[in-house]
């Protein structure tokens, strides 16, 4: 079964970084869904139709960037982007929500925006964050995957090993150079099935120079290598 993955997309440059990361996850067996959250409905019917059509066009452009025009797309109406994405993830049975970094992030750095930060505090779905300007890479591979040495949740190494195609003992550490993805587990005090970072993991997220995937406590993600990615 593929790993259903929602990409939060609003047409901004940094959300194209999220598309780039989503495409790399697709090469590992993820099935992608694009989502845009509208915060208010228009009181006038004509304006509401126009707003809905504009949101649909925006998501269509995102699917075009992915070179996958049949990618499922959802326009969500919610006062909170984080809440709207959380509810969509629960409804769709998604395992991951992917974000770009905050709009003011320096190239190559990772900085979760407000919505990502909210999901990182207790959401029942894994969260992935792309570094700024990831979209500029011709290809994003996930060959060199790192985990923190002190991560106590076994699902972290399990998931990272599947992504990298190596045994857990061969995974990189965050200090290693040329990392393609950092996988972080949720802290020991986190409710099972939810996301929650320890202070140490939060620091690793803030200093990361690669995409970051934060897993739910006790929940591994069963990625698969697609034939196209290994041929």
Named regions from a protein language model:
Residues 1-47, 71, 132, 141-181, ...:
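Small/aliphatic-rich secondary-structure junction motif
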Residues 10, 102, 124, 150, ...:
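Short glycine-/small-residue-rich Rossmann-like dinucleotide-binding loops
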Residues 48-60, 157:
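Short, surface-exposed alpha-helical segments at coil->helix boundaries
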Residues 116-136, 212:
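Short, structured interface segments
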Residues 76-84:
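Charged docking surfaces used in two-component/phosphorelay signaling
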Residues 20, 60, 64, 117, ...:
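Active-site phosphate/pyrophosphate- and oxyanion-stabilizing loops and adjacent acidic/basic residues
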Residues 90-95, 176-177:
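Glycine-rich phosphate-binding loop signature in dinucleotide/nucleotide-binding domains
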Residues 99-118, 184-207, 217-225:
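Glycine-rich, Arg-bearing micro-motifs that act as flexible, cationic patches
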